[in-house]
Swiss-Prot record:
<keyword id="KW-0175">Coiled coil</keyword>
<feature type="signal peptide">
    <location>
        <begin position="1"/>
        <end position="24"/>
    </location>
</feature>
<keyword id="KW-1003">Cell membrane</keyword>
<keyword id="KW-0134">Cell wall</keyword>
<keyword id="KW-0732">Signal</keyword>
<dbReference type="GO" id="GO:0005886">
    <property type="term" value="C:plasma membrane"/>
</dbReference>
<comment type="function">
    <text>S-layer small protein. May anchor the complex to the cell membrane.</text>
</comment>
<keyword id="KW-0812">Transmembrane</keyword>
<keyword id="KW-0701">S-layer</keyword>
<feature type="coiled-coil region">
    <location>
        <begin position="259"/>
        <end position="314"/>
    </location>
</feature>
<dbReference type="GO" id="GO:0030115">
    <property type="term" value="C:S-layer"/>
</dbReference>
<comment type="subunit">
    <text>The mushroom-shaped unit cells of the Sulfolobales' S-layers may consist of three SlaB subunits and six SlaA subunits.</text>
</comment>
<keyword id="KW-1133">Transmembrane helix</keyword>
<feature type="transmembrane region" description="Helical">
    <location>
        <begin position="373"/>
        <end position="393"/>
    </location>
</feature>
<protein>
    <recommendedName>
        <fullName>S-layer protein B</fullName>
    </recommendedName>
</protein>
<keyword id="KW-0964">Secreted</keyword>
<dbReference type="GO" id="GO:0005576">
    <property type="term" value="C:extracellular region"/>
</dbReference>
Length: 397
């Protein structure tokens, strides 16, 4: 009976508390906050805050902005939103708090400053939050392939292949196996030929992290490739808590990479051989065409040689005729020379004859004058005779 009364009392108290919490509100200006619902409400690092507020319904449909300020009053984030039909502003998981402990300020403002409200939240860490890194959540991949990794007694050992990109992933949890957001994870490695390399990141909201680094291949000669050691440390920090793990990574020869490289070379050679075969086939075709052309040319040369032979024969005949003509020419030249001499003599004789003709013409001219005088005298004498005869005849009659 006592147990039943106690249970009933506890239930009533729980219901009262739930009712109290569910109806808690905080008003600032003309903005009523339902989440956060209490000024200086506590939020843990890595947790998100949902903004649930109400402004006068007259501002329904207008734009609004949610501003979050760091403890030092600098702006951390500005989230635009819109007032719904009932005057509500609701943004689930609006912002996840990073590892910045202190009093944050959240303001809700309708565009134009017609409605403004402010509420403070206390961002802190859980009272006890030791960091542990569990083995089952630690993994390593290289070029998308999972690699061997082991975590025991604060030492991380793994085996990777050379000449690849390694991604190491894991989760950071607190003592209650809850994910920690905003924890810093740093990986420091001493890599041969590279030196000391430090990588750093922060965990996501689910406590996950990933770091990437390159594993060099010290030699490209297959017979000289051998394993080597990469040593270093992995440090996880969250608030005042820090834990460090030793890291030993054995980089073994990446024969798969070498084989792939050789396969690529073989593929390249095959491609080149195929191209050469194509070129050879083209050259053979060109050679066949050239042989055909050569055969045609040889046939044409044979024909030309035959024609040249005929031409040579013709030339020989013409040479003979030319010799004969040359002899005749020489003979004719001699005759022409002789004729030229005769013509010269004839020219001389002709000149003499021309002189004689000129003299004769002069003589003939003189004789012609005398002859014309004699003729005229004869005619006159004849006329006189005729007249005398006529006169005699008249007398007789």
């Amino acid at each position: 009976m006592v147990v039943k009364k106690t249970f009933v009392l506890s239930t009533l108290i729980l219901i009262s508390v739930v009712a109290l919490v569910s109806t808690a509100v905080y008003t600032s200006g003309n903005v009523t906050f339902y989440s956060p619902s209490v000024n200086n409400q506590i939020y843990y690092v890595g947790k998100s805050v949902t903004i649930d507020a109400v402004v006068p319904q007259q501002f329904a449909g207008q734009g609004a902005v949610i501003n979050l300020f760091f403890p030092n009053s600098t702006l951390a984030a500005s989230i635009p939103t819109t007032v719904n039909a009932t005057g509500g502003i609701y943004v689930p998981n609006a912002y996840t708090f990073p590892h910045v402990i202190g009093i944050w300020q959240i303001t809700v403002e309708v565009t134009g400053g017609v409605a403004v409200g402010t509420i403070d939240v206390n961002v802190t860490t859980p009272a006890v939050a030791p960091i542990i890194l569990t083995l089952q959540n630690l993994a390593m991949y290289e070029n998308t392939y999972p690699q061997f990794i082991e975590f025991a007694n604060g030492i991380i050992t793994s085996v990777v292949m050379q000449n690849g990109t390694v991604n190491i992933m894991g989760y950071v949890y607190n003592s209650t196996v809850g994910p920690l957001s905003g924890a810093t994870v740093s990986l420091t490695l001493n890599i041969p030929t590279v030196g000391t390399k430090t990588l750093s990141t922060t965990t996501a909201s689910n406590g996950s992290f990933m770091l990437s680094f390159q594993v060099p291949q010290l030699s490209t000669t297959l017979t000289l490739i051998s394993s080597y050691l990469i040593s270093g440390s992995l440090t996880v920090s969250y608030g005042v808590h820090t834990v460090t793990y030793n890291v030993f990574i054995t980089a073994i020869p990446n024969y798969l990479s070498v084989i792939n490289a050789l396969n690529n070379e073989v593929s390249t050679l095959r491609s080149e051989i195929s191209s050469l075969n194509s070129t050879i086939a083209s050259l053979n075709k060109s050679l066949a065409n050239a042989n055909t052309q050569i055969s045609n040319l040889q046939s044409e040369i044979t024909t030309l040689n035959s024609e040249i032979g005929k031409l040579n024969s013709t030339v020989g005949s013409l040479s003979t005729q030319l010799s004969s003509l040359s002899s005749q020419y020489n003979t004719l030249s001699s005759q022409v020379t002789a004729l030229n001499g005769k013509i010269s003599n004839l020219s001389t004789s002709l000149s003499t004859l021309n002189g004689e003709v000129a003299s004769l013409r002069s003589t003939v001219s003189s004789l012609t004058t005398i002859a014309y005088g004699g003729i005229i005298a004869g005619i006159i004498g004849l006329i006189v005779a005729i007249v005398a005869i006529v006169l005699v005849m008249r007398r007789i009659s």
